[in-house]
Each structure stands twice: as structure tokens, then as C-alpha cells.
Amino acid sequence: MVLRRSRRIAILSSLLGLFLLYHFVSFRPELYSRTYDAAAAAAAADPSECPDLPGMEDVLVVMKTGVTESLDKVPIHFKTTLRCVPNYIIFSDFEEEIEGVKIHDALRTMDSVVKDTVADFDLYNRLREQGRAGLDNSDFADEANSNIGKPNNPGWKLDKWKFLPMVQQALLHKDNAKWYVFMEADTYISWPTLLQWLAHFDPREPHYIGTETQIADVIFAHGGSGFVVSNPAMQLATNEYATRTIELNEYTDWHWAGDCVLGKVLADAGVPLHYSWPILQNSNVGELDEFAKGFYRKPWCFPAVGFHHLSKREIQDLHAFEKRRRQETDNPVLLHRDVFKELIYPELSNVRDSWDNLSDQEHPTINTFHECQILCAGSRHCAQFVIRDGICFTGETPRLGVSNPAVRSGWVLSNIDRMIDKAPRCSRPDFGV
């Protein structure tokens, strides 16, 4: 790729950027004005459906998706995570409507030179010319995630370019929001818990909050886990992008992770990341280790605000779970303790067929389920076991796991009960601040 570097082009690009900024601010229509009505209608139809969310009016929820997943993954959020949210906007690589809600093109304000010359934009340009008819089967082909993402997936290659323009457009969409909460289409956020957590931060200060991840020397918030940016930090990031557009486009082209690019921009602007783990998770419920020992924090008494890598069914189940909790308790804060006791523990049993509980301590000389069960039951430090490919694995902390027809799992409930009894009482949530 060759990006134009001459002084003349730089000046023209800057003038074009200022024109677009003026035009967008001065003449933009309401990008999505029905969210207030949707939230009010949901509350009127069923008061239990929408919890009291004081402060949510000062939050803009920003969802990022892509054309190859949006029709499948976005609609469930209209019935769950977004149902009672007064202000939200959804960005993709293709502008369209889904169930009457406008999906915005995150890349529409980007430099056309980049979009016309960078190979990553092949999918985007086909969409602009042909709409969804321009998609082919290879665009939907899944690819296993590697340590550098999915470099052969057209949608994934395009995704990194969305972050900086998305931040810019989100700020323009609601420039008076105190907080901007970014999520993806396979993310779930507990809004009551989020608001209780954010109450410990001053929105007048620049904040960048998320699950800490590192590539080279850049520490950034993992995008899929969800992350939060205050209004002053959004302004700083937008100013950086506006004044360093060519440089940052070159950096994005060289890089492979857009959330890392955003983290670098914020760091350059003097806004370091506030670490949020385990409050925001890059895991679904089945993968959670609520008794984790090997990290700098133990999840048990921390709020559980966000989950990632969720199916539509899992998002629906979490929404129903929170609705049920509202009817049973006045406490708006969901702790990891509650997730374990109320969601995970009831699913554990002595034996569970067609299930992998993700035990990872290998015992290669033990090859039968019965022997593996005896081994685990004989240790006070063993919480679970599994036979996987004819080999016994055990685990010292209980996890729910995932469906797998070729695997058989089990848990030692007496040991797990002992762990629960010894766990902290959580007299107050640990908000990590």
C-alpha cells in the first residue's frame, strides 16, 4: 500500500477532514432517535423488563459488528441488552437497517484514498457497489483465532479500521454523554452493575477502562470484553485522530488489532488504561474460573459487568437471569460470587456426559473415567475431572465448561462446597478502584 505523504496531500486531507467534521456536526440528522421510545415502551409494557437505571441517560452504548455477522447476532440485543438502553448506536462496515434500527457505516468518513488502495477494503468496496449481493461464501468462512487474529478472514481484516472512526462518530452522535461504553455483538453487559461501578470514577476526567491486553509495548483494552471511555478521553482520542490521520492510517495498516491502535492513540494523548479484570471478561460463563488463583485479583467479590464470546442463547439466558434476580433482590450489583452460586453451581454434578469442564491438569497414565473420578475424589484439592481423548485431566478450581459429545466430565461437589464455605463473604463489592 502507498499512502500519500506529500505536504500538499496532507494539507488537502486536513481541510477535507475539517469540512466533513463541520458538515457532520452542523447538518447531521438524528442518527437514531427511537431508542428513548423503545426503552419507554418496554418499561410500560412490563415494568420488570426495564430496571431503574439512574445515570444511564448519560451513557452512550456503542456496538461494533460486521456485515457477515450482523443479521445473525444483532437482533437478540434488541430484546435483551439494548431493550432498555436510552442511547445507543450500532456501527458496522455496511449501512443498512436491521429490524427497523439503522446500522451505521463506521468507515464512511475515512479517507477515500485509503479505502481505494488498501487491500483490506476489498470487502467494503464490494459492499458499496453491490450491497449484500456482493458477499460470497468465502466472506462467511470461519477461521480459527490465532495469536494474530484471523488474517485470512475478510471481515476480520477490515474490522481493525473501524475503531478510530467509530470513536470519532460516537462522540459526534452524542457529544454530551459522560461515558461511552463499547461492546461487540457477542458481548453482554449488566447495566445496573456497570452504573454502580462507574459511580466510582469522575466522568470529568479522562478515563479509559477495560480488560488489560498487551501487544509489544502497547497496553490496551480488549475490544470484545467491552471497554469504557469518558467524554474527555473521547475528545482527546478524536483530536489525535484528526491531527494525525495519515500517520495513524499508516499505523493501522501495519497493525492487526484495532483495539490496540485505539489504546496507543489514548496513551499518546496521556490517557493510560485503567485495568478492569475480572470486572470485564473476555470469557463466557462456561469458561469462567471464579476461584482463579494465578492472577493479581481473585474474582469472587468483584462485580461481573461484562461477558464475551456469547451465543444468542447465552445472551438471552443472562438477560433472563438478571430479570429474575431483580425480582428476588434489591441489590443491583452482580458479583462473580453470584454468577458462580446462581448460574454455574446448579449445573455441576457428579457425572455429566457429552460435556467438557475444561480441566487442564493431565494424568497420562489414567485412561478410564472411573479411575479419573477416584483420583479426583481422593484429593481435597481436586474440584473436577474429565476424560478427553482417553486421558484423564483434573482441575483444582470448578468451571462449568462447554458441550462436547466426545467428552465426559464430573465434579467433586463436597470439595466445591468446602471452597464456597471458605470463600470471602463479600460484605461490600470490590470495584478495583
For each feature predicted by the language model, list its residue ranges.
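C-terminal catalytic/acceptor-binding lobe
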Residues: 2-39, 254, 260, 265-433
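Short, well-formed alpha-helical segments that are part of the catalytic scaffolds
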Residues: 46, 69-81
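Short, acidic, metal-binding catalytic loop of nucleotide-sugar glycosyltransferases
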Residues: 56, 76-88, 95, 100
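Acidic donor-binding/catalytic loop of UDP-sugar-dependent glycosyltransferases
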Residues: 68-71, 176-177, 185-197
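Active-site-proximal specificity loops/subdomain of glycosyltransferases
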Residues: 93-177
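Short aromatic/hydrophobic "clamp" motif used to bind/position activated sugar donors
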Residues: 180
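Conserved catalytic core of nucleotide-sugar-dependent glycosyltransferases
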Residues: 187-268, 272, 280, 330-339, ...
